[in-house]
A protein has these predicted regions:
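Flexible, glycine/small-residue-enriched loop-and-beta-strand segment within the central core
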Residues: 47-56, 61-135, 162
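Terminal amphipathic alpha-helical/low-complexity segments used for targeting or macromolecular assembly
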Residues: 1-33, 37-39, 80, 86, ...
Length: 169
């Protein structure tokens, strides 16, 4: 059998890869997340509006190009759960005030309501999924790509669509 040849280009590639991985881990730890568990991975670029309200438990993974809009609501992802690219999390919602245009109200009078989003253990979330305020995804559930989760998903269910509907449990 032939030996694997380590050409200078291959060595440079691996060194660059290792450097970028270490640099990425340092950046994530400096974000000030509420919890960043052991072996958790938050791939960059990811936009988080309030990092102190994001809780990633052990062995969780969120791939890059994700956006988490959370001002007072919390986003909690428990052990062994993962999300593919372009996850969109929105913990806030606002109710319109009848008779008064929204843009005319001062910020203190806007009827915003933020609710926590909880992803239980061992959940798979596909690419381009949107999680809206109050969503609770049960243990072992699978969320299909491009789904809109606006209600609770029971444990060990497969949910797809916009809005999500249960196709298997």
């Amino acid at each position: 059998m032939g030996k694997i040849k380590y050409t200078p280009m291959r060595i440079v590639y691996h060194l660059k890869y290792l450097y970028l991985r270490c640099k990425e881990k340092r950046k994530v730890k400096n974000l000030g997340l509420g919890l960043y568990g052991k072996h958790a991975k938050l791939a960059l670029p990811t936009v988080i509006s309030n990092p102190s309200h994001v809780f990633l438990h052990d062995y969780t993974r969120i791939h890059g190009q994700s956006i988490i809009y959370n001002y007072t609501g919390k986003f909690i992802m428990k052990e062994y759960s993962g999300a593919s690219i372009e996850l969109l999390v929105v913990t806030g919602n606002h109710r319109p005030t009848v008779g008064i245009p929204h843009y005319m109200l001062p910020l203190s009078r806007i009827n915003d309501k933020e609710t926590d989003i909880i992803v239980e253990e061992d959940v798979w979330i596909g690419a381009r999924v949107t999680l809206l305020a109050g969503a609770h995804i049960g243990r072992g559930a699978v969320i299909g790509a491009s789904s809109l989760v606006n209600k609770d998903v029971p444990p060990y269910a497969v949910a797809v669509g916009s809005p999500t509907r249960i196709v298997a449990s």
